[in-house]
């Protein structure tokens, strides 16, 4: 059995936001757990390993109890949706996207979602989300449009997976910015902040948001690589793209990732210093939004080692020592059956139109 060790770079060593766990973690976990289990999407071991509740409570950690609960539901939904599309071809993935989009745009009278569990989950989630801001708030349409882009991009990812396509770094990042779901995830931060459209769409704020999206991708692809390698899904990972395009070995690819991430962090902090003022109360909402971005980036990294999703019981050791071992021919740290991937997904058929 061949083994290889490599060192993980500390991607966020200069990130000014610190770990913060929501005080509503246990309460939101209890409520959201009961909610997602009521749909019975797959076995509970997969949900425990993913731990959507910890992810939401580390990333939306300064929000109200209702907001943290909403974040838990969103993370749970993404997990279920990703697991379904991971075992779907592009045609099925596209139909699943239609179900979800229709349920958000027409929660009271959705013709396409029917009784499919993804449609039901979307309606339940969106009904609660609509209560988080005044009717007609721009945040609702922003969330829907970014969600639609994400759902359509996942269909493209399914095609890449079927064709065993490996993209170059820039091309990969363009697609990954949509397939990772970070844009709608960060759009949720806007709920209740009453930020006008012209502020949210200002080039300075857009640049900060896009940098946060990239940092989420870089952190996620670093931590998920071992698991994806053992599962045969490493073609849709930035490390693979770096290795192939730049002809680097695995360790040097991680060094490249670390250097690239440092540049993104530096640019984020530089752009933050140049942010214009819109006057109060808008500036207060902008500060809350930016702190939400910063906490999401930090919390995503914290969750990656604190949950069992990527490293099983070894997360804390890996966080401290930064040393990871890959073993060819076997799952690393956790197996498919432990994380609810593929073999534990019971795909609900989609009714023909």
Swiss-Prot record:
Q: Enumerate the residues binding Mg(2+) 1.
A: 82
- EC category name: lyase
Report the domain of life of the source organism: Eukaryota
Coiled-coil annotated residue ranges, if any: none
Required co-factor(s) are: Mg(2+)
- EC annotation from Swiss-Prot or TrEMBL: 4.2.3.-, 4.2.3.126, 4.2.3.198
Positions annotated to bind Mg(2+) 2: 82
Q: In this chain's numbering, which residues are marked as the site (Plays a critical role in the stabilization of intermediate cation)?
A: 79
User: Which biological process, per GO, is one annotated for this protein?
Assistant: isoprenoid biosynthetic process
- Which SUPFAM superfamilies does the record associate with it? Terpenoid synthases
Which residues span the membrane? none
Q: Any idea which positions bind (2E,6E)-farnesyl diphosphate?
A: 309-310
**Which key words are in the record?**
Lyase, Magnesium, Metal-binding
Q: Where is this motif: DDXXD motif?
A: 82-86
Q: Name one GO molecular function term.
A: metal ion binding
Annotated residues that bind Mg(2+) 3 are located at 220, 224, 228
Query: Which reaction(s) does its UniProt entry say it catalyses?
Result: (2E,6E)-farnesyl diphosphate = gamma-muurolene + diphosphate; (2E,6E)-farnesyl diphosphate = alpha-selinene + diphosphate; (2E,6E)-farnesyl diphosphate = delta-cadinene + diphosphate
Q: Determine if Lyase is one of this entry's keywords.
A: yes
State the protein's purpose: Terpene cyclase that catalyzes the cyclization of farnesyl diphosphate (FPP) to various sesquiterpenes, including beta-elemene, gamma-muurolene, alpha-selinene, beta-selinene, beta-cadinene, delta-cadinene and alpha-cadinol.
Task: Reproduce the free-text note on domains from the UniProt record.
Answer: The DDXXD motif is important for the catalytic activity, presumably through binding to Mg(2+).
Q: Which family does it belong to?
A: Belongs to the terpene synthase family.
- Which PANTHER family does this entry report, sorted A to Z? BETA-PINACENE SYNTHASE-RELATED, TERPENE SYNTHASE
Query: In its UniProt entry, what is this protein called?
Result: Sesquiterpene synthase Agr8
Provide the species name.
Cyclocybe aegerita
């Amino acid at each position: 059995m061949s083994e290889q060790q490599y060192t993980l770079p500390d991607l966020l060593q200069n990130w000014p936001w610190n770990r913060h766990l929501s005080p509503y973690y246990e309460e939101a976990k209890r409520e959201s757990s009961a909610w997602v289990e009521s749909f019975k999407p797959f076995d509970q071991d997969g949900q425990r390993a993913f731990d959507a509740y910890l992810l939401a409570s580390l990333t939306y950690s300064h929000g109200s109890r209702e907001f943290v609960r909403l974040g838990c539901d969103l993370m749970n939904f993404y997990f279920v949706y990703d697991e379904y599309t991971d075992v779907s071809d592009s045609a099925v993935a596209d139909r699943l996207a239609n179900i979800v989009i229709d349920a958000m745009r027409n929660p009271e009278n959705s013709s396409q979602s029917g009784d499919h569990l993804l449609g039901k989950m979307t309606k339940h989630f969106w009904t609660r989300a609509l209560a988080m801001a005044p009717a007609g708030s721009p945040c609702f349409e922003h969330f829907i449009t970014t969600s639609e882009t994400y759902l359509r991009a996942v269909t493209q990812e399914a095609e890449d997976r079927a064709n065993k396509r490996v993209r170059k770094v820039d091309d990969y990042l363009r697609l990954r910015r949509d397939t990772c779901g970070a844009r709608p995830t960060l759009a949720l931060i806007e709920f209740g902040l009453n930020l006008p459209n012209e502020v949210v769409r200002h080039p300075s704020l857009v640049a900060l948001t896009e940098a946060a999206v990239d940092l989420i991708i870089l952190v996620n692809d670093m931590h998920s690589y071992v698991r994806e390698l053992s599962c045969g899904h490493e073609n849709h990972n930035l490390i693979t793209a770096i290795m192939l395009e730049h002809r680097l070995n695995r360790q040097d690819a991680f060094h490249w990732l670390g250097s690239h991430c440092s540049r993104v962090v530096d640019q984020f902090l530089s752009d933050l210093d140049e942010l214009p003022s819109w006057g109060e109360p808008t500036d207060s909402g902008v500060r809350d939004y930016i702190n939400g971005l910063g906490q999401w980036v930090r919390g995503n990294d914290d969750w990656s080692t604190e949950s069992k999703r990527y490293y099983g019981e070894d997360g804390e050791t890996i966080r401290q020592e930064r040393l990871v071992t890959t073993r060819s021919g076997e799952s690393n740290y956790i197996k498919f059956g432990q994380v609810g991937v593929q073999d534990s997904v019971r795909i609900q058929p989609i009714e023909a139109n």
